[in-house]
């Protein structure tokens, strides 16, 4: 494997040296019953070793196979108040696809959330362009009302859009209102599934067959898994 990795021009050079059997710490192997338990065991081990050996948190590293797996460790670390830094990527909740899904949740909980509104109104693309969004922002500022209020009452506030754009705006409004209505009878996991499917987020991600697209898909699936754990 190392002979192939060496062909990578961007690879960081390293020398792999085998150790003698009588040197180094033995490897502990454990089997966890769930990813949540795995995260807790790893973090508890860090706390134990830090206490025994008078170490600092920056003396420890957690290696995982895929980016999506970082969530469970990040949550376990946060629960115990342990600071951490992600190397070679972003923290799970800072990844674009995760922030996109969470923005839909934020808008469902609070339709007047302007940051969430701007992030979701045309993502995935639904034909509501920057010009229209800028008009909504201007009308909102001039009338002292939220962006959502303008979207729901475009003619009352004199928003100048054509019939096609109006129909697309109303389609978005109806989508969000349906999620809001579902909030009464469905839990976060069920609403999360609805959001990624009906908004078109998962469909867009699945159309990207690159390694990055696969990673984004795995991240979204891991987010939904976390919601399921929360609701269980």
Q: What annotation goes with each model-predicted range?
A:
Residues 1-83, 106-110, 166:
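Helicase P-loop NTPase motor core
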Residues 10-16, 89-91, 112-115, 222-224:
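Short, surface-exposed, polar/charged, turn-prone segments marking secondary-structure boundaries
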Residues 56, 70-82, 95, 102-232:
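Conserved helicase C-terminal RecA-like lobe
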Residues 62, 88-89, 152, 208:
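Proline- and acidic/polar-enriched loop/turn elements at helix boundaries
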Residues 65, 91-92:
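Positions that flank functional sites
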Residues 81-91:
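Conserved RecA-like helicase motor-core motifs
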């Amino acid at each position: 494997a190392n002979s192939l990795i060496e062909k990578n021009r961007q690879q960081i050079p390293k020398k792999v040296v085998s150790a003698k059997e009588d040197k180094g710490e033995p490897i502990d192997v454990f089997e966890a019953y769930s990813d949540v338990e795995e995260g807790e065991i790893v973090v508890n081990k860090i706390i134990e070793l830090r206490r025994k050996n008078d170490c600092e948190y920056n003396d420890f590293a957690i290696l995982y196979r895929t980016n999506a797996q970082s969530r469970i460790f990040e949550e376990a670390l946060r629960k115990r108040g342990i600071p951490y830094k992600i190397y070679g990527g972003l923290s799970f909740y800072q990844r674009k696809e995760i922030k996109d899904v969470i923005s839909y949740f934020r808008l469902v909980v609070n339709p007047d959330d302007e940051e969430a509104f701007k992030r979701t109104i045309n993502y995935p693309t639904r034909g509501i362009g920057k010009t229209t969004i800028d008009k909504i922002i201007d009308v909102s500022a001039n009338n002292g009302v939220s962006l959502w209020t303008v979207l729901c009452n475009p003619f009352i506030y004199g928003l100048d859009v054509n019939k096609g754009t109006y129909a697309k705006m109303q389609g978005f409004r109806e989508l969000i209102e349906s999620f809001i209505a579902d909030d009464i009878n469905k839990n976060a996991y069920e609403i999360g599934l609805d959001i990624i499917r009906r908004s078109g987020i998962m469909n867009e991600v699945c159309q990207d067959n690159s390694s990055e697209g696969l990673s984004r898909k795995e991240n979204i699936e891991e987010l939904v898994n976390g919601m399921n754990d929360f609701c269980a």
